[in-house]
């Protein structure tokens, strides 16, 4: 922690005090000054084991506004499967924490595990009584997210997929809300009571 603070302070000081360093206009755009290498496009600081690249031109992220309505999801089901219970527990904690940080309601349940057994010969050229049995246990976790917009779902899914641990698979099922098509008429059961009332009179 202290080392990170020292390097952060050093980087800020170099960034603010970069006006004091002179950049010579030689064949290359790199100048050497007291063990520091400076470039016009990138400020590069070198110590014995420290390399800090600080971009000179920081661009602000652009926000785009589109006229299209955002996609609405009624439910987003994320099924995660793996072979190690501790890894799944840790990933479940991470995914729930990320969902709560984004203000998404999440429910977690654990489907029953699946066990596959293979009984094989110990070697190809051996008698049948010499066998070995292999067992694969697949554990599952299911995260149910409800009432999401398309942009929130995309951000959340990209975040948890980038941090997916090794040996863990993910399956995502999306249930989208859509408007009722115009070609579908009114339900038949709304018109039936009126016809029955007319036939009685």
Curated annotation (Swiss-Prot):
GO terms for cellular component: mitochondrial inner membrane; mitochondrial small ribosomal subunit; mitochondrion. InterPro entries: Ribosomal_uS10_dom, Ribosomal_uS10_dom_sf, Ribosomal_uS10m. Keywords: Mitochondrion, Ribonucleoprotein, Ribosomal protein. The keyword Signal does not apply. It is found in: Mitochondrion. It comes from the Eukaryota. Its main location: mitochondrion. Belongs to the universal ribosomal protein uS10 family. Component of the mitochondrial ribosome small subunit (28S) which comprises a 12S rRNA and about 30 distinct proteins. This is Small ribosomal subunit protein uS10m. The gene is MRPS10.
